[in-house]
Amino acid sequence: MRGPGHPLLLGLLLVLGAAGRGRGGAEPREPADGQALLRLVVELVQELRKHHSAEHKGLQLLGRDCALGRAEAAGLGPSPEQRVEIVPRDLRMKDKFLKHLTGPLYFSPKCSKHFHRLYHNTRDCTIPAYYKRCARLLTRLAVSPVCMEDKQ
């Protein structure tokens, strides 16, 4: 991506070159002026390179983020170390969120197998976007006839 900086640099070099030739034979040129002019041009080129490399790095990082998104979608996902850090906090938040939505729920020993299957193995209770569905399913399970038998 060489956008507007490349023509600007070319134009600057043309202007500097034309200004140097314009003096011609009227004034004798000293080598120090030529060195100063060359040093100035080199500094300008370095500034432009820094500016373009910063833009290029930003674009590379953006591209890398998109590539990671595709990799995660393909099932590669983040490294196992990152998963270990995320899961415990997520489980606590899941529990708090579901208790907030459902209130205190009681499941009889007969019903605990159904509860564990629902809570740990369904999409609704494992993906945070579906926690409201999970809360609805858990409350329906708690008041179902199978789970209400031991309460009476």
UniProtKB/Swiss-Prot annotation:
The keyword Oxidoreductase does not apply. Widely expressed with highest levels in adrenal gland and modest levels in pancreas, testis and uterus. This is ALK and LTK ligand 2. Its main location: secreted. Residues 1-24 form the signal peptide. PANTHER family: ALK AND LTK LIGAND 2, ALK AND LTK LIGAND 2-RELATED. Disulfide bonds join C111-C147, C125-C134. Homodimer; interchain disulfide bond is not required for homodimerization. Belongs to the ALKAL family. It is found in: Secreted; Cell membrane. Keywords: Cell membrane, Cytokine, Disulfide bond, Membrane, Secreted, Signal. The gene is ALKAL2. Pfam families: ALKL1_2.
